[in-house]
Amino acid sequence: MRRHPPLDPTMAPGPEDNVRNLRKRQARGPGTARGCGPEVGGRRKNRQKRRMVAQASPGKDKVERDRSVAASGAEKATRRRVERPRGQVSPSDRRGIQAAKEAELRLQTERHTKEKRKVTEASSDDPQPEIDLVRKESLTSSESFQTVECLQSLSKEGIVEGIKRRRIRNKKLKSLENPPLKVTENEATQNIKVEFQDELYKNTPKYSCNILSPEVENNSILKLHVCNCFPHSKGCNDENNLPYKPDGGCMHVAENSSKLKKENLRSLAEKSDTNSIPRLLQTKESVMGVNKLLLEESDLCQSKTNDLLSCLQREKNKYSIEESSVGRKSRKRIKSEKAVTESETVTEMNFYEYNKSELMLQENKMIADGKEAETKSPLNVLRKVSHNTVSLMDHLLSLPEMVGKETSPEHHVNAVCQKTIEPLLKEETENASEPLGYESMAQTEDFKSMKSSIGKSPNEYHIEKRSSQEELRRESEELKLSCQRTIPMTGKRTWPYYSCARISAWCWKKASLPESSYFLPGSQESCRQDDVLKHQTNQTHLTDSKLLLQSSLTETNIESSSKEKLDSNSNCLSSVSAIEHTLMVMKEPIIEDDKKIKSEELSKSGSEVVSNTTEDTQLISETQILTGNKKKDRGNLTKLNLIATSKDGQEANNSTGRTIHRKSCVAKQTFVAPDLVKILNTGRLTNFKIPLLKNKTEKRKEINAKSSEREAYSPLELLDNLSGAEVRQNRSKESVSMTTSGPQTLSIQNSVTPAQASSDSFYDKNSCSIYPRFTKQDNNNKPSNHISERGNIVSNKEVASLTVENNTFSYDPGYVEKNSFFSCNEQETFQPVSSEVSVRKITKNFSEIKVGSPDILKAYEDDVLLIDVIQDDPDLFGVSNEGELSCTSGVSRISQEPNVAGEDQSADFKYMETPVKKEPSDNLRELSVLDTGSIKSEACASNSAASEIRHDSKDVNTSLGKVANKASENETLEDFSEQIKGSNLDKKHRFTDKVIIKEEKEKIYEVCKSKDSRNADIMVDECQFAAPVPKPLCLLVPPLNLSGHQEETVLNTWTNDFRFLGKHSVLKLQNPATCEIFKREKNVGVLQKSLGLMLPYKYCRFHFNTLRGCERPLCKFVHVPEQGDEKVCMDVFKKYININELCLLQRAVNIFMEYYRKFPPGIHFDLQVLNDLLNSLLKHCLLKEVFQIVNLSIMVKIQPSLKILLNIFEHVATMKLRNAVPALTDIFCKLIEAGMVLDPEHFNYIVKLLYQVQASKQEITAVLEMRSRLQTRLFKKNWKCDLDSALNKLEHCKEKGDWTRLGKLYLNVKMGCEKLADFETFCACIAKTLTKHYEKEGPDVPFCEFAETVSKDPQNSKVDESVLGRIGISALFFYHKLLQWSKGRKVLDKLYELKIHFTSLKGLIGPEMLASRCQIVNVAAEIFLKSGSLNGAIWVMRESEWIINTPLWPCDRLDVLNRHNLLCTIAHDILAKSLFRQAFEVLQNLPGFQNSQETVEVSQYSILFNKLLDSCIESNSLGTSSSVAEFMISKSVPIDFSFLRRLITSLGRSCLWLKARAHYKSALSLGCYPQLEGNLYRKLLLIPSYLSEIEMLLAMEIFMVSNASSIQSPGTSTQILQIVLKRCENNQSQRNDDYQAAVERLIMAARISDPKLFIKHMTVNINKEQVYSLEHCSVLKWLKENMKWAGKVWLFSNH
């Protein structure tokens, strides 16, 4: 971006400010920058500048208003913000601006004296757009105007002026502290601080906190919005009470950043005193001097940084502990009050946490000037806020709307950020004290004020710092000047942090600002909605930068920084994040230099993008540093963090949120990274004159191009592939985990793995939950905007990703970018969140970043002389991809893989959005995880510590979510292997299986073996690659778990080669979404070696043909062989077994289970392969998988070898796996039942092993039972094989008549014979032996003895019964044929005794084999009859259910005839015995009565039935008689009427009237009785005289019922019912006695009725027949009583 025009005269500091500034100048000496004396001078100059700024503050307010009105472009807007409003102010402001420019020029000249200053100056140019944005925001108030003026002047003049501006800001703050300014201090002061700080920081971050400050600025904006919400910004929020106050509109800037800004500008302008404008002008004028002073002070601060840092860290730890004990809300409130009343104090606290060096310098300044400390503290606050604001401004600049509207909201944001970020900036300044000399001094002052605000004995703390201030400054300067980095692990010289190898790719000119502005649409929107989130993010960045600085600092500095971090974490972890940028730059000469230069370059390339990127990077770096330093300082920082977390869960949550925001920012950075990568790939790296770099770059480019062409996942992927070329270079053992490709990230190699492990794992959850935190803390859920802003930052920052050697966390802007995108998605603020939009934006950023390449080239030129090129330095030159595969290269590959995972996550960002809904409690837990991760990361700084931390990070990863890691790992592996193939690296990198495995192990040994390693698969590089996609924070960065050796190598690699060679950072992503990216970036990242399998086209190469397998969430290729591809299965199994890797063996188990569950074994199945697989599984102690395979094998009728079974038992016994015994016993029994044969010694051995493992008695008994079964089976097999010998024995038994022995022989054969045909053959032989072949006469029946022996067998079964029944049938036919009824009877009796139902069986031999059931029953019944057993015959009939001929049991007509004859015979025999019921049963089952198929005439059975009926009547068996009569009538069997009449009479006399009436009615229908006669006038009943009285009565009943209607009618009383007793027509000569008897029976019939009937004799007719009449009254009475039942019986038929 072009530098902003010089500040207008309106910016000139006011008179009051001038006075203050003069005082300060007097207080300070001219030489404060170089020593104590110079420091004092610098302070004086700063005070003078501040006075000038204070004078210009009134003008700034107007300028702010004007700026908020007019802002069309990023640069124009910023310029307008600064120029227009200020231009509208008085000319004094212009003079102040000119003065500031001059001071800035002077400061720039001084800076150019040192390379670091140059870098800083270069970076200061970039963040101007952000500065403008911040200025707009700060213009809202007079103080903000002052800040804006200073910032503008700094942006124009350079870093020096930026420093001066900070001083001016501090002075302005002091001036603002004046009563009129105090009135608006909540808003105006804060805004001014933020504005001023933003401008200063925007310019400053370029050289001092380049990366950090932009991020800090953005963070400050977010902090302003989220100060209330961010738990980790407690301290900052406390200091940022101004945003909390009604005046502080920062809290809601995210929602309506433009509106709020405007409103804030208005309100602030109104609130700010008119004097603020002149103060600002004065400040502007003094800006130049202030800048110089600041630079000098920065030098002094750097020199004293180390000492002060140690003190600050200790104090900070104490403070963090105390603050953690204090309630989050209370601390925030207290800090807010302090921020309002004691901006100095707040500033000090912030700087105290922000930058140790700055704090120390500030402390010295405080010693020099207490009042100055107050003024400086505001200035520091402004600086911090400016850092935060710069980031925020960058974000706002990135947001087009924010560019024009930022003025007031940005001011509020800055104000809020100032307080919120102050602690963070302090720590950041401390960490970045080298680059921020002026900031260091100002921050020192701020630190002083912070002390007071901290409430800890900060005075003591500052005193300690004061004592070591000068030393720290010297050390900081030495660090600045230091061009080499010392790596104890490798002993190699280190490269300056601003080295060309590390900065060129990171540095971006202002042109990169448009890149960030590409994000601006979404970022701006995000900013509006999520300014609070920005604030949180800024705090998070501060925390990150704090962490980075701490890690980079020496152990002493680290301790102090950790203390400060604790304090800052307690107060505002987010501020620490903002500070992280500075810290990263300042901590170690190497890391600091790299970071510093990178941040500066980034600032140059685009202050907005760089600032955002820096902010994001700072978040991650800072968080990483926190985690890393915390890890190092387990005693201090870890404890403090834990204390802070436990004491204040909200604070812990805040810190966690900050960390997450940090990552989010990193994701944003990653978003921009593709552009940066493109630029680097396009030409910057080519300009580097490092051996092998170009070649590697070209090679990587080719690979990336291939992978991108082959896997056209997204433009992001293509960009990442472009960067992947360099990534491969880095991967070839140039440990530069930070890759210009796609997401260039800040990675701390040494600590990267563990730090990542911890922070990533922590961030995994937190990234998702951070937005929930932000959502809860900031109702607007602004993190998305904040993240998008960071994304913008990342575009520049990404290129400038910083790598902190000692910092545990590898900063992956891409990853953070993804997270930020995710938040944007959730917030829906960042509308173009889609991957395509993101890609487009990235492309734009890339092109814009490309514009900023000259800065990188310049940085390269500047640093090329400082680089000691070691020909054998693998960090710089790397190792060829094909040749050497060192741990470093493996690590690099791993770090590259994460980019692919990042892509996946970006693709799945929707899925990741859900984590945003996490509860604050989750965030708190995540915070604790973060602490652990940070400790781990710090430990990673050293190789030994790295391994330990790796384990810790593993735990963290596990706690975060192993499943996601696993999924991501699998997907990553699969996609990676595909990329290898796509990039045609199969041939180059194709090794033997073992070599491939080893290489894979070096790269991802932990990945394959542990879930943590799976997390490691998901790397931030992948996230970076996917960063363009709106993958939200959900793209968690799981910790990278590497072996100690790998970690060590990684650390060394980072240290030796920090340059941006296109390598991806080592941060890994835990979410499955990252797997997708991870897969896509496999070409750029770790290349999976092909296993050399020849697979069909449809099969997934990654799943089958790579060690790590397929990791796609939804892979379109086949993962399980299809039917008919069993040969492929066998080949895969053989290959996996040959490689003998755990992950491959487990995959083989899965393939085996999936395939053979669906398809049975085929011709290609190889039992040896199965056995080998089981052996391999046992060697790896995969007993569960062994059981699975064996169980499935048994189901598909495949038995492993006996040796395998014994090996399993041995393994269980050796390992004392008591719990596995039940399952193993069950498998053993199944195998025995399936046919496995064991020798007795095998059984004994197994039982012995079971005793060793202390198996239960039941389990051992089961094994013994299986031995018995096996023995029986063996016996059966023996008999089966010796059937001939059994037949011989049968003959022997026959000859000797030993039928009992024959029965035993039968049992043995039955047990040993397995084929039914053989068994039936043997049984047939027995039947023949028992029948035909036995012709001896005698009472003995062989069958009976044989059946007796067989039936006594305890294992007698239905089979035995069937065999005996069939043999018995053969014997029956045999004896029936021979008419040997007695022997046949014995056979039948034996069958009856044994309850063998032979009637349903057939014989074994001869015609009986085809005999029908009717025939068999007939034979048996006949035998019974012939033997005199009638009951036996009936039993046989009943046993056969009287079946004759049925469809189921058909028979011949002969059989039917035989049955008829047999039944008739039985019936006669039964009747003879008067067994009427049995006789009737037999007669009922005669042929013809059962079914229609029997065409037999039933009339022929009349004689039998009438005989039976007569016999029954005579015997008075009325029941049977009645049944027989009914059956005969129903079956139409002719019945004798005499028998029927006798039956009716008998029934009537027996009072069985119902049956009597029924039979009478049936007889009447048959014509047994005459029909009724009569007419209408006369009713006549003819009763034969031969009827009995019963029959007569029944006839009268019918007569009365038939005429009931006429009888009962009223008019028929005269009608007469006549009865004529007829004489027998056939017997005319009937005697009178008989007739007279008939008359008496008639009278008796009338009397029998109930009620009685009365008859009267009327006359004798011509035939001498008596005529009687029924009395009418008696008939009426009878009908009345009996008509109901009588009508039913007589009037209705029974059928």
UniProtKB/Swiss-Prot annotation:
Residues 735-753 have a biased composition (Polar residues). This is Protein TOPAZ1. Keywords: Cytoplasm, Differentiation, Spermatogenesis. Important for normal spermatogenesis and male fertility. Specifically required for progression to the post-meiotic stages of spermatocyte development. Seems to be necessary for normal expression levels of a number of testis-expressed gene transcripts, although its role in this process is unclear. It comes from the Eukaryota. Residues 1-128, 441-474, 725-753 are annotated as: Disordered. Residues 43-52 have a biased composition (Basic residues). The lineage of its organism: Eukaryota, Metazoa, Chordata, Craniata, Vertebrata. Pfam families: Asp_Glu_race_2 (PF14669). One of its GO terms (cellular component) is cytosol. It comes from Callithrix jacchus (White-tufted-ear marmoset).
